[in-house]
Amino acid sequence: MPSDPPGPEGRAVTNAAYNPWHAGYGWTTVPERLQSAGISWKTYQEWDNFGDNNLEYFTAFKKVAAGLLGRPSLLPYELQTLAGFYLALPSMPAPVQDAAVLALENAADQLSPADRQLYDRALYRSRPGTLAAEFRKDVESGRLPQVSYLVPSEVDSEHPSGSSPAASATLLYRVLDAIASDPDLWAKTAVIVNFDENDGYFDHVPPPRPPRSVEAEWVGNQPLGLGPRVPMTIISPWTVGGFVCSQIFDHTSVTQFLETRFGITQTEIDPWRRTVSGDLTSAFDFANPRSRPTLARPQPTPPLEPRWTPTPPTEQRMPLQESGTRPARALPYQPDAYTTVNPETGSLTVHLVNAGAASTHLALYPYAGEFDEPRHYDLLGEVDDTVALSDRVYSLTLLGPNGFRREFSGATDSAAASLDVSTTIDAGTRALVLTANNSGSRALSVDVDGDRRKLAAGARGRWAVASVDGWYQAIVTVDEDPEFKRVLVGHIENGRTSVSQPT
């Protein structure tokens, strides 16, 4: 289907807009919002933009392109769209190529002032290999807009079909070198580098899933959600130092950042996505800008080599992770969770807490058939969720951002069925305070990471699990009950810079 529901107001749920005869999407784009607010903007692209200028797939810009090309019957079939026009240009003899470009420029001169602005800012493409030069030219002339979109060609895109990391790094260096050539410009500029897809392999961190009540985030029985993780790099005076920011973001976060900076509102972002995804400001330290670092000029880009195809191992094994830690930004989350087992009713209550300033997304996974599909929570404050247990055994895992993890396993009729282990977070001392309450009729030996204590019937024990740079990890077991286990992993925020999770 081209969209859902059909028509220009439908959602983009497929790649149908790549079809040149697609009507285009009718909602207002972010650049149009910027323009209405008097914010200057421009798209930098070459003849080959690899189909990645999404503005070309919206009705307002399709109309401008149609006005440029005239009536379709007057042009060869393959030149009836701007994409087709630029795709055909490289194979034309030089004189024919120059004449075609001149004809397009003359057609642009006939556009209305409003359409000409849209053409110049969104649809104009410079000759191959000139994107960085065009960008530098605007920097040097003082014409760089407040918001710039850079759409690289295939050879500079880092896409494995025709590019390489070396090629994209060279383009990025040239762009940053242009910005850094003007100290005043560097002092007020942020460069956000996005990737539009992952490597195609399994991502061990599941993305937030929207609740079924948010109709805008579902297509049939399939949630849109945030998809697999992709890298994003922010280069600016306020992000120097290799900091990691583990707040949840998605591609609308860039738009939310523009909203925060320029006071626009993109009404097409639904409330659930705003709840889950931040506006990128937590990745910046605006109070302490840094001077621009000096970087070595990259070597010439080597020729593209044939790509290797990785062979999946016959047996699953943990992938290697970079050793050590990175400096990390403070996060607006403070999640915690614990359970209470109710043997009489055959149920278990999960107590969920987030004492942070922003909503966090948690996902509860059943590993003993407790329910049919994972349960998802968008949490700010506290909530309890009761799980009916159809079997005596339970095994639940709760996952959240920045390595947050809880594992709850045991049985409703075992020796430790009446042992409740609750937790609270002491942000001041950055400790996880654990309380074990033995409401049963027999004594239990409770072990918290080697600190074993005998709790008589009706007794209560308290442990303070220390953290390192805010990171804690604890395992709770009971000698008399091999089925009982609690695993507690996470990071305690205190509003200050920390480090990434140690490997």
Predicted regions and their residues:
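N-terminal pro-sequences and low-complexity stem/linker regions of secreted or lumenal proteins
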Residues: M1-T503
